[in-house]
Amino acid sequence: MDNLQGELVSFPASQQECRISAKIPVSPSEGIEGHCFKVEEDYEEPALQSGTPPFFTKQDYESPPQDTNDLCELQADSSGSGRKEENLQLSKTVRDAMPALEKLLSNDWREILLGTKESLAEKELQLLFMIHQLTRLRDQLLSAHSEHRNMAAMLFEKQQQQMELARQQQEQIVKQQQQLIQQQHKINLLQQQIQHVNMPYVMIPAFPPAQTVTADPQMSLPIQPIPCKPVEYPMSLLHNSTTRGSVSAKRQETSQPLNLTAKPTDQVPNSRSSPKYRMSPVGSQGGSSMDSASSPQKANLPLGFLGEGDAITKAIQEACQLLHGQNTSPEHHQQKYRKELLDTLPEKEVQDGASLQHTEESVLGCNMDIDGSRGSHIKRPMNAFMVWAKDERRKILQAFPDMHNSSISKILGSRWKSMSNAEKQPYYEEQARLSRQHLERYPDYKYKPRPKRTCIVEGKRLRVGEYKALMKNRRQDTRQGYVITSIGALQCPPSPSGFSSQSLLDNLSQLPSSDHYNPQDCNIQVVKSHLLVSHEPHGAIPMAKDICSDSEDSGKSDGELVVITD
């Protein structure tokens, strides 16, 4: 059943305003005659005004779906009986107006509430368009989300790759550092071996006349080369007698400079002007040895680094083979040969040669005196770093015996720099203790720095390098003045094995000059011994009038020879 509410407005001829309110309840009341609806009417007659049309204000009703014939009763709630007639008229009016009202209201309200077909189609199109837009927006959001997720995955993968590359690069850097350390260690070992092997070509060594060569079973073993310090002029190596001992003793002996001017205790002093020459059999594959029962000393010459096809090695091997076939008393023949050689030489040449050799031995003697005077030198007290490095250097040498001293110093310096002050404090305390102890022992000690070394040669002050270059040039000039052909007139002593000095000298004359070779590292003091004789009797060998002195010794005479190193 539909609920309807409306307003009825009528304009009666009497120009009276009437208001009818009709209420039709939802639930019908049942009476004797059947279904009926309750209708309530309120009638009101207000004061009439001229010019204002009367009208119905409001009417509430419920229209049943049946016809108006089904309406049974009209119950009016009025106080008076006079109103019953009016209610009947009103009910008739309502019954007459109900179909028109229903028709009017049904059309308007249905159109408003339900809408027409055109409006529904338009709304459907709008809804479809909105659904399409929402679908597109959803697809865009999904694609953007997937792209964002893919980008995040790609960025994460790139970060992982970069981290992996960085880790690999770090590992490669660590490996390269380790390889560099190993290569540096190998380079140090090779440098040491090169320093041992890289020695100048040597002449035949000069031995004292009372010393004889004995058979040494150790000479067939490979000979260890001796480390050298660099010099600017070539010299022949003297005999170096070493005792076989522990490895540490060998290191200490090779690290110290050799005293070449000291004479052996079991040999007899002899004239310096005419030294006697002996051959030391050393080759690349081993050499022969010479026997003698008069002296127990053993001769080892470090010539193992020379090649097999070297002219020096061939000459020395040939001389050794010739000397090996001599009789048991070679001293007699050699003394006789030396005497005859001195007799045949002019007196001036002998004196010049003796003076040249005396000059060179005097230089070595000065060095000996200087080295000997160093024993009275007062050393400075050790500082904290030296105290700490003393034990650390020993530990590194025990772990790496072949490591170079420069590498050890670099390692110690970096370690000391990385130490904290608290770790260095005990060593500073030890430094203070050593300083106090040194002050107690030497109260008058004053540190004097080493003076600059200068040489005065023929009234000119020269540096040490200039002095060495000058001496080298003089030795070259002296060597060029010798004539080998003048030795052919000398008388050689007879030899039962057919040994002749001429063949030996011919072999020596073919040897390459050692003046063009500058050794890199030589720690051995050497003496140049000349076999050849000057052709010119006078002026071939100049007298040495060189003075090597310190800055405060410049007033000494030209004939005095002084070398000061400290």
UniProtKB/Swiss-Prot annotation:
Extract the Pfam families matched here. HMG_box (PF00505)
Keyword annotations for this protein, in alphabetical order, are: DNA-binding, Nucleus, Transcription, Transcription regulation
Tell me which stretches of the chain form a coiled coil: none
**Entry annotated with the keyword Transferase:** no
Task: Give the UniProt subcellular location, in the record's own words.
Answer: Nucleus
Q: Name one GO molecular function term.
A: sequence-specific DNA binding
**Taxonomic superkingdom:** Eukaryota
Query: Any idea which residues the entry calls the DNA-binding region?
Result: 378-446
Q: Chief subcellular site?
A: nucleus
Q: Which InterPro entries match?
A: HMG_box_dom, HMG_box_dom_sf, SOX/SOX-like_TF
Q: Does the keyword Protease apply?
A: no
* Stretches the record annotates as Disordered: 47-69, 242-301, 545-566
Question: How does it associate, per the subunit comment?
Answer: Homodimer.
Briefly state the protein's biological role.
Transcription factor that binds to DNA at the consensus sequence 5'-AACAAT-3'.
The record's section on PANTHER family has: FI18025P1, TRANSCRIPTION FACTOR SOX-13
Q: What is this protein called?
A: Transcription factor Sox-13
Q: Which gene encodes it?
A: sox13
